[in-house]
Amino acid sequence: MVKTNKQDILKGILLGLVTLSVLTSVYYLNTSSTTQESEADNDYLKSEICYYALQGIKSDYHYHLQLNITIDGERIEIPTNIGFERDENGDTLFLHPIHTYDNSGRVHVETTRNATAELGFFFDIWGEEFSEENILDYNTGTEYVIEMFINNEPVDTFENTILEPYIFIDINYKIKN
């Protein structure tokens, strides 16, 4: 009779451990898939640099570049505080890893080691369009062209341009020659 009670207790403990293991596994599987689904809603959130910033971890690299946009010969002002998310009181809730502090065109990039930041990420954060056919609210159509230069050298990488320290990016929207 005593032996049966010990066996029942051992069976109960074993069954409890198996149940706990199964429930823990189900919880973690559901939690990780929910996180992946919410991140899939925004391509930028898939990038390593934004994930790093969302975790509140300091960056490994902090560098600057200059971005100049010209539309029909007129320089466009790049707004102050692109990349700052604020609450209703104006307090900063979050700072994206690619951001501005003023309207000079100086872009700050704060990344992890081995992260790749692209110019398209900056435009996504800004909430503006940029590609070979579009810049801000301007479309090339048949009469216009977008030319892009890095350090005065023509490039055709547009939104896929990799941001590097101390480069000068000039984007010109103009009538085709």
Q: Which functions belong to the PLM regions below?
A:
Residues 2-177:
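Ubiquitin-like/PB1-type beta-grasp interaction modules and other compact soluble beta-rich domains
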